[in-house]
Amino acid sequence: MVERNGPVNVAILAVPEVTASALYGMFDLFSSPGRDFPFIVSGVAGEQRMRPYVVARAADGFSAANGIWVKPDHGFDDCPKPDIVCIPDFFVNPGESVAGRYDAEARWLKRVHDDGAMLASSGAVLLGEAGLLTNCEATIHWGYVDTLADNYPGVTVRPRQSLVLSGVAQRIVMAGGGSSWQDLALYLIARFVGLKEAMEVAKVYMLQWHDMGQQPFASLLRLRQTSDAVINRCQEWLGRNYKTSSPVAAMTGLSGLPERSFGRRFAKATGLTALDYAHALRLEEAKQMLETGDLAIEAIANEVGYEDASFFSRLFRRRIGLTPAQYRLRFGSLHRALQQR
């Protein structure tokens, strides 16, 4: 815990693409330490230990993602000195670079970090734009892993982790996007206020730590648009015939290319080897079957093209991070609960 006098100043950075759930969810959680738990259990609010405020390049209101109206408390020019700057995740096209789009935000982040602020992000692209991730480890939402790795080559991306600390004195912390901003908030409350207060906030808001990481939630396939008609035809064929016993040999024959040429073109077009692509397609289908039905795991293995159920289970565990039975328990129960509503 960081020893200090007075409330912790937490600036929450807003851009037009910001997601309201993370922006205002963080605001609620950072308003809570010291105040809400005593109110819930005794009817008397305690002393608020953190002071959150929304900051943007200017204090003018704007429409954010999904049409939510955001009215910043401060612009960069009149923002109180922050102890922490939080960067919520935001919606941009994963296939596009944001170079130059957030120059003002990048300069401000660099300045306040140099001035001592801790940076906490569930949208690590802005940290990359500020040049703060070079030779650092990072994490980000599974849908943006390639974006981060491709556009900021000095970064070591840890896609399986839901929380990563980095930088000098670990003054940069990143969460994996989605609802893992809750983990980020709890970590910061524990670090700057205290573990007891972080636990109280978790109890008030009934939060659960994302200890599984991102891997079970992530799609194994990144569907890329490609101008390679031969590879497109092979992808379409595999989508209909993923159960075939030798999918790579079959696609090579379909392409009419030499084996090595086919392998190079497939990897260039899809970002995966042909074998990895076939495995990913089969495992995505297996995930759907585990979520929505009660077919035995051995039968599912056979249905998606694996005669050896033990090999299927090992591969599933390695790629997904859970065994098939664990995945069914976690996501099948969610599917059933939603279906009954």
Regions inferred by a protein language model and the residue ranges of each:
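Flexible gly/pro-rich beta->alpha loop and the following alpha-helix that scaffold active-site loops
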Residues: 51-117
